[in-house]
């Protein structure tokens, strides 16, 4: 499920980042889909990551569909954020 264009999260990374490779491997093994953007090849993405991180190009940076941001998270933190985004089933009144 990795590298999914319409995934609920975007992974900003670099090819030579060991933390990025570790996180991608863990998300791949967990079946978590994501869109990957290499900040060394995409100047706009690099600017966004620097803006998010107070002027620093910190990777891996994950941006979720609800605009929540995690920097160098564990796969468990990614799962928790995805779970918090899942819609809660509504219960009809009177039930």
Protein language model annotation of sequence segments:
Residues 18, 43-44, 57, 77:
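Short alpha-helical
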Residues 32-46, 56:
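Thiol-based oxidoreductase modules, predominantly thioredoxin-like and allied folds used
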Residues 1-7, 88-95:
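Short, low-complexity, intrinsically disordered N-terminal peptides in bacterial proteins
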Residues 64-94:
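Non-catalytic, surface beta->alpha helical segment in thiol-disulfide oxidoreductase systems
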Residues 1-33:
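Local sequence-structure signature of Cys/Sec-based thiol-disulfide redox active-site neighborhoods
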Residues 49-53, 82:
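Short amphipathic alpha-helix with an adjacent loop that forms part of the alpha/beta core around
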